[in-house]
């Protein structure tokens, strides 16, 4: 429906509307930092959080590498919508329910709309940079996990249940859903178990860009 409304509008209107919709992701980050009295567990280092922060940058700058990166990173929001079991416990139409599902829906949908509305062109040449940037961010986030967990242990920081807090951004420490559990069963080592996902990412990106690659060859 959003695509139908915007497809004949000029680029400024398209960008402005998508920027407004992307604010749900930013507001969700702020909400989680404030609402649960444990901001260290809700820092914006998950894949979908980083995606939420990158969407406005891509929309404002029209940067091709960032825009094409979003196509891969939006998958994190889709996975969160499908397999996050804790979200199933949210009270229907509560603030928590709405901020979670609205923000993740837009974090998945806006990157698709960016390309469908031709605000940024699809470019298969960005596949290497997308994979390299993703790997670098994953490495950085893993070290953030290690550093924060050491800080938590030293300062004995505990959650509302009295358990020692363990941060697990981007799930580099341990799996949090059946899909990641499969890879952890193959390689039961923190961080390393996530790496076999990159060949899958590569195949996913090739499938997305194949029509563009074929079209470009025909145009030559």
Model-derived segments and their meaning:
Residues 1, 44-54, 70, 101-109:
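Membrane-embedded alpha-helical segments of multi-pass membrane proteins
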Residues 1-31:
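Alpha-helical transmembrane segments and their cytosolic membrane-interface
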Residues 2, 55, 106-125, 138-139:
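Alpha-helical transmembrane segments in multipass membrane proteins, preferentially the mid-helix core
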Residues 5-16, 60-66, 117-128:
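Membrane-interface helix-boundary motifs at transmembrane edges
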Residues 15-17, 43-46, 67-74:
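Cytoplasmic-side transmembrane-helix entry/capping segments in multi-pass membrane proteins
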Residues 23-33, 73-86, 134-143:
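Aromatic-anchored segments of alpha-helical transmembrane domains
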Residues 33-42, 61-64, 85-99:
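Membrane-interface helix caps and helix-loop-helix hairpins in membrane proteins
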Residues 129-132, 150-205:
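Membrane-interface transmembrane-helix boundary segments in multi-pass integral membrane proteins
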């Amino acid at each position: 429906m959003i695509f139908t409304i915007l497809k004949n509008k000029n680029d400024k209107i398209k960008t402005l509307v998508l920027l407004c919709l992307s604010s749900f992701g930013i507001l969700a980050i702020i909400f989680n930092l404030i609402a649960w009295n444990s901001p260290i567990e809700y820092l914006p280092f998950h894949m979908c959080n980083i995606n939420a922060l990158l969407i406005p940058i891509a929309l404002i700058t029209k940067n091709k590498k960032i825009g094409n990166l979003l196509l891969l990173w939006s998958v994190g929001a889709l996975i969160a919508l499908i397999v996050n079991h804790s979200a199933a416990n949210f009270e229907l139409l509560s603030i928590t329910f709405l901020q979670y599902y609205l923000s993740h829906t837009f974090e998945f949908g806006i990157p698709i709309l960016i390309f469908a509305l031709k605000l940024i062109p699809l470019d298969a040449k960005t596949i290497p940079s997308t994979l390299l940037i993703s790997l670098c961010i994953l490495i950085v986030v893993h070290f953030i996990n290690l550093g924060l967990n050491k800080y938590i242990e030293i300062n004995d920081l505990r959650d509302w249940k009295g358990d020692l807090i363990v941060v697990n951004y981007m799930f580099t420490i341990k799996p949090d859903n059946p899909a990641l559990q499969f890879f952890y069963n193959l390689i039961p080592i923190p961080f390393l178990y996530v790496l076999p996902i990159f060949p899958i990412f590569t195949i996913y990106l090739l499938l997305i860009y194949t029509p563009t690659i074929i079209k470009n060859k025909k145009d030559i």
